[in-house]
Swiss-Prot record:
Alphabetical keyword list: Chloroplast, Glycoprotein, Lyase, Magnesium, Manganese, Metal-binding, Plastid, Transit peptide
Binding annotation for Mg(2+) 1: D336, D340
Main location: plastid
Residues with glycosylation annotation: N27, N204, N317, N382, N463, N507
Annotated binding of Mg(2+) 3, by residue: N480, E488
Source species of the chain: Antirrhinum majus (Garden snapdragon)
Domain notes: The Asp-Asp-Xaa-Xaa-Asp/Glu (DDXXD/E) motif is important for the catalytic activity, presumably through binding to Mg(2+).
Pfam families named among the record's database cross-references: Terpene_synth, Terpene_synth_C
Similarity remark: Belongs to the terpene synthase family. Tpsg subfamily.
Subcellular location: Plastid, Chloroplast stroma
UniProt-annotated binding residues for Mg(2+) 2: D336, D340
UniProt name for this protein: Tricyclene synthase 0e23, chloroplastic
A Gene Ontology cellular-component term: chloroplast stroma
Claim: Plastid is one of the keywords in the record: yes
């Protein structure tokens, strides 16, 4: 099932039903016996308007968009006014200054105040990092302090929460009445590392009490708490959660109105930029013309762009990077469709060999319907490498070629599993699907597009990010399979992680397998938290945030109601791209 969003005068289908492995193309797919649902966007052939129509709609909107020249005077004044408020709170009320910093992050305006925020956190860390000092503060204040410090690379021991336990070793009974503190404790627990048992206890305790109290809460509070339980800040996209946080601020602080106004101004600027970028992507896709040659492949430039937009949503100035990254995302889908729809096993072996050669002369060995895709892949990635070289002085083509070779090899493994008619072990599946998910391709391209890895940069190498990328790939893969498992067409032989794990544990129920998958996601988040924390260098902060956004985006992509639609993603898309 797909629903349509009216965007910029055009109707854009944004399909959210799981990408069916059997039902959609059972007569054309060469590999129906084994088909993963990658990134969960079905190829609903025929439902997407031709790119030329989308291009025209975007062009029309470009002329009707409100003039950006009207913004700067008031916009800059609002930024300066907020900066002044930050200074005042830092001097007069250290705890409220932390609440202020948290609010800027949740509303997505913190990028304006990096120096001020850093100074506030530095002072706060110097005075509160000791567990003995924290015992004089409330659960809310300690939890917020813990969150902010870990988010910004300052280590605070989880032992600070021992101050809120009684002699029994359990969290104190009176905390059950502290809704505000419990919500912040739940948020703090999302930043745990492996082995931090007290944070596991904190998450279970706070979640259980808050869920139990929801029914008795006043409507606005119930909605606020419910949203935070479902989408904790650390594992969500700030621009999305900020929709709800705007209501949470209410009239609690005199600076709330100022922050809301600044957030709305930011949103106006961002929408204009995103619309222009989508126009560029549409133009590139239309000129490429591959959708005319590969008529069964997914023809969805808007959806390709969504990944780049959300991953880099915190950095509006990285417009060139978003557009360039979208091209890589598009080719992940195109090559995926070649493996799923167009190629026999022998043809796919030849295609993989051609990618391994990375030479235009290999085009002659390919079937006609693969030649154009192969040549444009080489053109596009070689072009990306050249742009990176011109911008940063180093050429990453060898690394980029390697990641595309790995992706196609992983796709080929899937095709061979399909040809054999059997499921791999759960571990074999996960090791291969980490690669075939496309996560490594996206993040490695992003790594170099953001200027990292050059000989003169010195602070971080690509290999330093491998574990971080691995955890994100597993999170994406498992969430993808959990989303696909809700598809009514599933029959237990579709090649998901759940199917492979169930095959090895035949006594487990579907609910138990589902719970195991969620536990695996939780473990990988803890590893991701640690890897992210360890990559604590100014030069890598933007890449780290973008990589985390990749993992955070997954629940938005794969959150369904009973009708197999995605109300969460629909709301986010409309909010970010509609005037």
């Amino acid at each position: 099932m797909a629903f349509c969003i009216s965007y910029l005068g055009a109707v854009l289908p944004f399909s959210l039903s799981p990408r069916t492995k059997f039902a959609i193309f059972h007569n054309t797919s060469k590999h129906a016996a084994y088909k993963t649902c990658r990134w969960n966007i079905p190829r609903d052939v025929g439902s997407t308007p031709p790119p030329s129509k989308l291009h025209q709609a975007l062009c029309l909107n470009a002329h009707s968009t409100s003039c950006m020249a009207e913004l700067p005077m008031d916009y800059e004044g609002k930024i300066q006014g907020t900066r002044h408020l930050l200074h005042l709170k830092d001097e007069n009320d250290p705890i409220e200054s932390l609440i202020f910093v948290d609010a800027t992050q949740r509303l997505g305006v913190n990028h304006h105040f990096q120096k001020e925020i850093e100074e506030i956190l530095r002072k706060s860390y110097a005075t509160m990092k000791s567990p003995s000092i924290c015992k004089y503060h409330t659960l809310h204040d300690v939890s917020l302090f813990f969150c902010l410090m870990r988010q910004h690379g300052r280590y605070v021991s989880a032992d600070v929460f021992n101050n809120f336990k009684g002699e029994s070793g359990r969290f104190k009974e009176e905390l059950k009445r502290d809704t505000r503190g419990l919500v912040e404790l739940y948020e703090a627990a999302q930043l745990s590392f492996e082995g931090e048992r007290i944070l596991d206890e904190a998450e279970n305790f706070s979640r259980q009490i808050l869920h139990g109290n929801l029914a008795s809460m006043e409507d606005n509070l119930r909605r606020s708490v419910g949203n935070k339980l479902r989408y904790p800040f650390h594992k969500s996209i700030a621009r999305f959660t900020g929709i709800n946080y705007d209501d949470d601020l209410g009239g609690m602080y005199e600076w709330g109105k100022t922050l809301r106004e600044l957030a709305l101004m930011d949103l106006q600027v961002e929408r204009s930029v995103y619309q222009e970028e989508l126009l560029q992507v549409s133009k590139w896709w239309n000129e490429l013309g591959l959708y005319k040659k590969l008529t069964l492949a997914r023809n969805r430039p808007f959806e390709f762009y969504m990944w780049s937009m959300v991953i880099l949503t915190d950095y509006i100035n990285l417009s060139e990077q978003r557009v360039e990254l979208t091209k890589s995302v598009a080719f992940i889908y195109l090559i995926d469709d070649i493996f799923d729809v167009y190629g026999t096993l022998d043809e796919l072996i030849i295609f993989t060999e051609a990618v391994n050669k990375w030479d235009y002369s290999a085009t002659d060995t390919l079937p006609d319907n693969m030649k154009m895709c192969y040549m444009t892949l080489l053109d596009t990635i070689n072009g990306t490498s050249q742009k990176i070289y011109e911008k940063y002085g180093h050429n990453p083509i060898d690394s980029l070629k390697t990641t595309w070779k790995s992706l196609c090899s992983a796709f080929l493994v899937e095709a061979k599993w399909s040809a054999s008619g059997s499921l791999p072990s759960a571990n074999e599946y996960l090791e291969n699907e980490k690669v075939s998910s496309g996560v490594y391709v996206v993040l490695i391209h992003l790594f170099f597009l953001m200027g990292l890895g050059g000989t003169n940069r010195g602070s971080i190498e690509l290999n330093d990010t491998r574990e971080l990328m691995s955890s994100i790939a597993i999170i994406v893969r498992i969430w993808n399979d959990l989303g696909c498992a809700k598809n009514e067409h599933q029959n237990g032989k579709d090649g998901s992680y759940l199917d492979c794990y169930k095959k090895e544990h035949i006594n487990l129920t579907a609910a138990q397998v589902h719970e195991h998958a969620l536990e695996l996601v939780a473990i990988e988040w803890k590893r991701l938290n640690k890897e992210s924390f360890n990559l604590n260098h100014d030069s890598v902060s933007s890449f780290k945030q973008a990589a985390l956004n990749f993992a955070r985006m997954v629940p938005l992509m794969y959150s369904y109601d009973n009708n197999r639609r995605g109300p969460v993603l629909e709301e986010y898309v409309k909010f970010m791209l509609s005037d």
